[in-house]
Amino acid sequence: MGVAALPPSRCHQMSDLPDDFDCTITTWEYIYGLCRDVSDQVRDDDFEPDVVVALARGGWFAGRCLCDFLGLDDLTSLKMEHYVGTAEKSGEPSVRYPMPEGSVEGKDVLIIDDIADTGGSIERAYEYVTDRDAGEVRTATLQLLGTSEYQPDYVGERLAEWTWIVYPWNFIEDMVDLVSSVMGQADQESFTQEEIRHYLAEFHGIDRIEMEIAQPDRVPEVLDEMERRDVLESAGPGEWRLADG
């Protein structure tokens, strides 16, 4: 679905992307498996970190899993300001919420994030941590896009083609953005649930089978939440339109 025409990373405003940029829906089980793969690589490499630094927000789940797999109880977080919403960003990566003083001093550190597309966030995190008198610092991502200029030490999965990954922990957030986008692009006033599904498949390659296998029965939940947030409004029984303003 037009992946080759995409810009080199997803770090663009939604308006800068083609209408048909590709998306992939993931499951908790699949991502848990990637966490295990990363932990296996760390052990095979004989690296024994003292602390895991999980980049907020995408690295939190992976950070907790890695602590479990590696037998660690020292987990801290670092917030890098980059993405605002689906396919949107706010400038270059910078530290928004720094780590507590002394949290990595003299310790071997493993930094984990969910994905690297340009690699800017995790590279900046590496620089930040090493500047705080840490011991050995290594980096890991669950997934790595071929567009990344930074190569982490450990990678759960390498993705040759660009795609926007919809993770289980931000499913609602991403789907609100995506549904709003396809409704704005389609040339009609109101939409049934089936029409919304059709446009998700047409513009983003999210077909019904993929959605229902990965996140079963969740489209109605997304639409209800969009109504609650005043993004959508009822256009009659079983139909919705984008809310004004």
Question: Where are the predicted features?
Answer:
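PRPP-associated nucleotide enzymes
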Residues: 1-245
